[in-house]
Amino acid sequence: MPQGNNSRRTVLPRSQEGNGGEQRIAKLLARAGIASRREVERMIADGRIALHGERVNTPATLLTGLSGVTVDGKPVRAASATRLFRFYKPQGTITAERDPKGRTTIYDRLPRGLPRLMPVGRLDFMTEGLLLLTNDGELKRQLELPRTGVVRTYRARAFGQVTQAQLEELAEGVTIEGVHYGSIDANLERRTGRNAWIEMSLAEGKNREVRRVLAYLGLQVSRLIRTAYGPFTLAGLEPGGVDEIATSELDAFRQTLK
């Protein structure tokens, strides 16, 4: 598997920096790949993070680096170069590190030898397709934020009848049971008997959004595949397959982010 050989310095907004280059500990730990910033905040609340042996009580603690910081008693390594991987998540896997019910997780399907990786967003248990993985919690957060505008594309096989005109109405957004879903570009690809294949592109990632929107149209989804996340696609990957995105591609993509 190719290795990234270039690092990319993230320019921090002034509001997130302290004096003398200090940064919040939650941000530093996210950048080091410990977890997302929100997850780091939970770890601090649970008393799992310490500085020189003393428990850290707030994610707003300002530091210039991670020297002396431990997580669960283990020293934290300095951040390495940002890396991004494509993973074809199979059906029947959980997008989590562990599952109380004992179901297979994405980490059970990943090969050994990879760095510590975090998923960008989630795919539910029966959804398959492209899941991006990164060692950089700040990149993860940036790609997940709706304001970043990264488009996710899905193909759904659904039982029932729908017209292209109905799908085009989704471009205006739709509110279902009090939850508003933003503009969706939806196209009827083909019909096979009572089933239809529909492609949908959207720039947000609300929980089970595609399934709920199609159910609102009277359709029952029997298969759902995420085929793209931004410029990255499933091309060349089989279920369970993983590869690394070239550093040059990652850098070019980051230049386009809002």
Give, region by region, the residue ranges found by the protein language model:
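Basic, flexible Lys/Arg- and Gly-enriched helix-loop patches that mediate nucleic-acid binding at interfaces
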Residues: 2-258
